[in-house]
Amino acid sequence: MRLNHKQGEAGEDAALAFLQSQGCTLLARNWHCAYGEIDLIVKNGGMILFVEVKYRKNRQFGGAAYSISPSKLLKLQRSVEYYLQQNRLTNVPCRLDAVLIEGSRPPEWIQNITG
């Protein structure tokens, strides 16, 4: 397993533990479709959260938030729409979030990254 892949998995583990500590329940992890991948799908109360996890060793080059490009955001939005259609959840409240992890800092939960 490559080092970056291991770091990514460790970042997802940390993000999931953080979200669970905030009351979220895991529905799916690394969900794939033709449009892309959703790192974590969790339920928080009556809302489904689609979570992009970004890990960086430090804030160099803009940090974790900088790595969510407009094209990545579009892929995420399309993946979310597809997931909702495939699971007949089009009337369920949902949101696209990010959990940013930079080095040893606590995770940062950014809610509604689509604006």
Swiss-Prot record:
It comes from the Bacteria. GO terms for molecular function: nucleic acid binding. Gene3D superfamilies: 3.40.1350.10. Belongs to the UPF0102 family. NCBIfam families: PRK12497.1-3, YraN family protein. This is UPF0102 protein NMC2069. It comes from Neisseria meningitidis serogroup C / serotype 2a (strain ATCC 700532 / DSM 15464 / FAM18).
